[in-house]
Amino acid sequence: MAHEVHRIKPKLGRTQIFWVFLAFRVLNAVLTRTFFQADEFWQALEPAHWKAFKYGELTWEWKFGVRSYLFPMIFELTYRLVSLSSILLHYALLLLSTIGSDLLILLLPKYELSWQVAEDLKRLPFDVTRSFEYYGVIYAPKIVMAVLASIGEYYIVRFVQKLYLLTLDKRNEKEEEERRSGLSEITKFALLLSLTNFFNCFFITRTFINSFEMILTSIALYYWDWTGGQMIKESSFTKSLIFAFLACLQRPSSGLIWVIPSISLILNLVGKKQYHLLFITFSKVLRSFFLVFTANAIIDMYFYEKVTFPFFRFLKFNFTTPLSKFYGVAPWHFHFFQSLPIVLGASIPAFAFGLFFPLSKRSFPKKYLNPFFQVKLTILLNLLVYSTLPHKEFRFIFPLQPLFILISSFGLLRLDRDYWKRLSGLKSLLWLVPFVSVFIALLLDTFHESGSIEVMKFLHEEPEIDSLGFIMPCHSTPGQSYLHRSDIQDLWSITCNPPLHLLGDPEAYSKLETYMDESDHLYDDISAFIYKNFPPPFRKDLRSPGKTYSHEWPTYLVVFEHMENAFLKDFLKDSSYIEYNRFFNSLAHWDSRRSGDIIIYYKLPFDYSDIPAADI
């Protein structure tokens, strides 16, 4: 059976498939310059930056130890490579500039211009390497993520090809030849559906753990034994277990994907009384788990500097306490009627057809041995279980994307063969749909919420910043992964830490309802929050004697337009603050607090406290 899978090859070779994905995703990643959700930065790039450059800020998840460091470590290594490259570049340029400036002075010592150029040459290595390091910090993780995404999508196509060949009807030679000739066609459909999927174009190259989980799952699904036990002795099955366990240790919920395939495999081995294969299976499972768990534990110990098992803390926080509700509660049908359409995109019709109609005419001795039955049941199980959890987001079901593309590809193949020949005119129009999806995704990648990124790039370029503050919902911008400055003495933002003190509290459910974080207090009553937590912005001698404040007014103050209109514009109009710059962020936003532009206020060096009160 293993040889059967590799005997027939499509017209588009494996190397070509990978390079198509890589070229497209690198472009996709480089063009992406917008903000989607905080986890893209604060759960991947920020801890990596903190570890690589020794400065930055960690969110509560990293302080509490609920995150595994494997994924961020990829970017730490990336940052370290960027840093090393910038150091080597600096010394190379320093050598060249020193030689160049000395030669210039030696040859043309009488000209003042020669001395000026020589001074500029000496400064050049510092300016170039500073820019090189910053752009490396910004773009190197994008390239790395594009490579990882390409690997994941490549294995999605391989997974589709594998199941296509495994589900051929061997009893009908004529049909078998017809279906074998369709391998190139199914490859083309899988390639197209993955490349032009709206959510893939918008999400897959962003540094979310869900993207990494999907990539690991794609590899594991391809190497999985879909024959019911005939390939258990192969090294490919071991690879599947390793990548599956890696995904599970990053996010334990990934284990749901493997419930149905595992049960089907065990049932078949038990039914056939192949106990020796069952023993080999469990042996491989234990060895693979031990290997992955040990490696992952070492990586986590490297980051936390003590023995830490984020896997168990993640389960405790999300499944044994109500604290996950702190980040929002969605209705039970959210994943069925919102997440699924968003992740599927334009492939909804093909997916629906593939889901409700048989995709293989091959008969299986047991229904549960049919790979398509396992895949469909896996999708249903995951959606049902995720629907029982209070906190829901689109990206939580993204690891199911390989299964979605599998069903959609086979659905599209059958639609193409059985129906579209009668609708040749409509078929040409339908080819426009995927490209419209890409266009919309690119608009969101380059336009909507671009201010959250651009403001950090701008602040990086400012010559001197003594203090910088963000009065906006927590984590509305990246941190040091885009700011990349260690010289700011006072850097703060509004926080939104969950009530970790309620862990283990029997009254956590009721207390959670009344808990308010700093962001909640701010927007509950903006004026009261400002007067309580900030000193008067006009005169230092107006401060209440002996009173300490949570925040001081910074030299640079960053706010959303909503905050400006609601309070700060009038409040600061007689202060030394001026509007310094403004960045477009969104035309509309689901969160009204983040609506409009992002504005930078700058506090002029002139201070009213320099003038005696009697003279005002």
UniProtKB/Swiss-Prot annotation:
It comes from the Eukaryota. GO terms for molecular function: alpha-1,2-mannosyltransferase activity. It is found in: Endoplasmic reticulum membrane. InterPro entries: GPI_mannosylTrfase. Its EC number is 2.4.1.-. Its main location: endoplasmic reticulum. One of its GO terms (biological process) is GPI anchor biosynthetic process. The keyword Transferase applies. The chain crosses the membrane at residues 17-37, 87-107, 137-157, 189-209, 241-261, 279-299, 339-359, 393-413, 424-444. Residues 38-86, 158-188, 262-278, 360-392, 445-616 are lumenal. It is an enzyme of class 2 (transferase). Residues 1-16, 108-136, 210-240, 300-338, 414-423 are cytoplasmic. Mannosyltransferase involved in glycosylphosphatidylinositol-anchor biosynthesis. Transfers the third mannose to Man2-GlcN-acyl-PI during GPI precursor assembly. This is GPI mannosyltransferase 3. It comes from Saccharomyces cerevisiae (strain ATCC 204508 / S288c) (Baker's yeast).
